């Protein structure tokens, strides 16, 4: 059963927060040991997965690199993202914070297939607390990406779901494994987590649509839905969630 947790975790600090950049500015000096990984950290990684690392000269398909190595070309990698200047600012704040500076990235996999209406991207973030976080990118600005979103409403499976499952099944680690994503990326994380044979610690679902067929899982699922959500309520099989301000 899903455990829907509001991103109003900010209220625990008794201070108003505007966005995830503010969160890093305020709490980036706390390590993951001092304050454990939470759904805001997951949302940040999910947003960073939209950055077009596949356009970099640095190989993260077969190699492991610190995220800080991308600083000199981050403006270029953010050009094709929504609100490039905010993604760039988020990334700069991220890599220069004590909380995230040691995080590395690898296992980048992308697949854009117009004929099969498939837009897929996944990557793995290696956290210093013996945890690997697999992030699935959500819908991009392409027609194919939006068409694949539409297909979720009437198809039992879409090509990206199969790719997500294969990605997780083929991933080998002795560390704790977390899956997460935003929008369609959250749906992919949930699909892969439910069907994989690999042990999963938990899944973070940030405004992701559900499935045509209701599912059951013993894996802890944290779901966040903003007030203005449309995608996150599609095919939602339960009303047990909290709305967050957006």
Question: Locations of the language-model features?
Answer:
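Catalytic cysteine-centered active loop of the rhodanese-like fold, especially the PTP/DSP P-loop
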Residues: 175-178, 191
């Amino acid at each position: 059963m899903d455990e829907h947790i509001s991103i109003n975790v900010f209220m625990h600090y008794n201070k108003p927060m505007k966005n995830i950049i503010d969160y890093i500015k305020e709490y980036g000096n706390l390590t993951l040991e001092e304050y454990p990984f939470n759904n805001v950290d997951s949302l940040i990684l999910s947003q960073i997965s939209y950055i077009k690392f596949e356009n970099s000269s640095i190989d993260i398909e077969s190699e492991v690199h610190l995220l800080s190595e991308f600083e000199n070309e981050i403006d270029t990698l953010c050009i094709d993202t929504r609100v490039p200047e905010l993604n760039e600012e988020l990334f700069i704040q991220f890599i220069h914070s004590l909380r995230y500076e040691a995080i590395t990235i690898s296992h980048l996999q992308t697949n854009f297939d117009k004929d099969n209406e498939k837009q897929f991207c996944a990557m793995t973030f290696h956290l210093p607390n013996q945890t690997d976080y697999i992030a699935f990118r959500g819908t991009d600005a392409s027609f194919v990406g939006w068409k694949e979103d539409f297909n979720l409403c009437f198809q039992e499976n879409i090509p990206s779901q199969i790719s997500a499952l294969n990605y997780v099944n083929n991933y080998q680690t002795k560390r704790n494994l977390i899956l997460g994503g935003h929008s369609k990326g959250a749906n992919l994380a949930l699909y892969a987590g439910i069907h994989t044979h690999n042990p999963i610690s938990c899944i973070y679902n940030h405004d992701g649509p559900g499935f045509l067929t209701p599912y059951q899982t013993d894996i802890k699922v944290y779901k966040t839905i903003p007030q203005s959500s449309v995608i996150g309520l599609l095919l939602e099989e339960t009303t047990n969630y909290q709305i967050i301000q957006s």
